A protein has these predicted regions:
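Hydrophobic faces of well-ordered beta-strands that scaffold small-molecule active sites
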Residues: 48-52, 76-78, 115-117, 141-143, ...
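Glycine-rich, positively charged N-terminal anion/phosphate-binding segment
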Residues: 1-46
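Catalytic cores of alpha/beta
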Residues: 58-70, 123-136, 185-188, 198-217
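Glycine-rich beta-to-alpha transition loops that act as phosphate-gripper elements at the mouths
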Residues: 51-54, 119-124, 174, 190-202
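Glycine-rich phosphate-binding active-site loops on the catalytic face of alpha/beta enzymes
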Residues: 75, 79-84, 140-150, 197-198, ...
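C-terminal helical cap(s) of enzyme catalytic domains, especially alpha/beta-barrels
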Residues: 4-14, 152-166, 208, 220-248
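Alpha-helix-loop-beta-strand connector modules within alpha/beta enzyme cores
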Residues: 26-45, 95-117, 161-192, 231-247
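Glycine/Thr-rich beta-alpha phosphate-binding loop at enzyme active sites
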Residues: 17, 83-98, 129-190
Length: 276
């Protein structure tokens, strides 16, 4: 289990919010004992990814081995890019191609379930990281995680978050997310999950046109609990107005050199269980 970072953990600003949750979670044994059985027993066809993160390379492998035989989930999202892990002092696995290769390949040999690698928005050589994750056996990529930044409370000159810095999410992250999806689309045939500022049907369409096979919504639900259902309704209306009958028709495909997108129909629809 992880207690996570000191409060306050969330701070709002005009462009979205900062969070510094610190990967707080119930831990492996409680997840096996309580969380996954509930999903198995209460959701008809669970399309859930378990998000895992380790302080060390070996911890990723321990989590995969500990969860792989359990029911109630589809696959793993390998969080290589959380900027709020105090024990790693902001050092991201996603910015080290050799670490990405070691973690993805090690997880791959330990499970036959789908593996989704979650990458960083501030990677100076994202195309290389994408290629490494692809070569080592990832089935899809999540782009992007939050972007490290800070907010200051000027009434007492201290950071607004208990941990000091945090990660940007919401509309302010959207340009970074779109850029990353576009870059990754040119570097791999894998399906891409677009993340960052998906607030409405319009932003979902933007991610699809950039190359995202699916999108994730998180911060939007903090602002408006019905954001997801309204976005779905908005997509249906958008499709009618623009004579588009299927989401796949919107998704920008990779260049011919990378062949067609490797379709994973198991991922439609899908939910991610875990904090960025």
């Amino acid at each position: 289990p992880r207690v996570g970072n000191a409060p306050p953990r969330v701070a709002e600003f005009k462009g979205g919010m900062l969070n510094s949750i610190g990967l707080a979670n119930p831990g492996l044994e409680r997840t096996k004992r309580e969380k996954l059985p509930w999903i198995r027993d209460n959701i008809c066809r669970p399309r859930v990814l378990v998000s895992i993160a380790g302080h060390t390379v070996a911890e990723f492998f321990t989590l995969v081995e500990g969860l792989d035989s359990e029911d109630g989930f589809l696959g793993f999202e390998i969080n290589l890019s959380c900027p709020n892990d105090a024990e790693r002092a902001g050092e991201l696995f996603a910015l080290d191609p050799s670490a990405v290769a070691e973690i993805i390949s090690g997880c791959r040999i330990r499970t036959e379930r789908p593996i989704v690698a979650k990458l960083a928005p501030n990677d100076p050589d994202l195309s290389r990281t994408v290629q490494v994750a692809t070569e080592e056996g990832a089935n899809a990529l999540t782009l992007v995680n939050t972007l490290p930044r800070a907010l200051l409370d000027i009434s007492n000159d201290v950071p607004e978050l208990g941990a000091g810095d945090g990660g940007i999410s919401g509309p302010a992250l959207q340009p970074s997310g779109l850029r990353a999806v576009r870059e990754a689309r040119s570097a791999t045939h894998l399906p891409l999950f677009g993340v960052g500022g998906v607030m409405t049907a319009t932003t979902a369409v933007e991610y699809a046109r950039a190359g995202a096979a699916l999108v994730q919504m998180g911060t939007a639900s903090f602002a408006w609990p019905r954001a997801v259902t309204e976005a779905i309704a908005g997509l249906i209306q958008w499709g009618r107005e623009h004579r588009v009958s299927a989401w796949d028709d919107l998704v920008s495909k990779p260049p011919a050199a990378n062949a067609s997108v490797n379709r994973l129909d198991l991922f439609d629809p899908i939910e991610s269980s875990g904090e960025g």
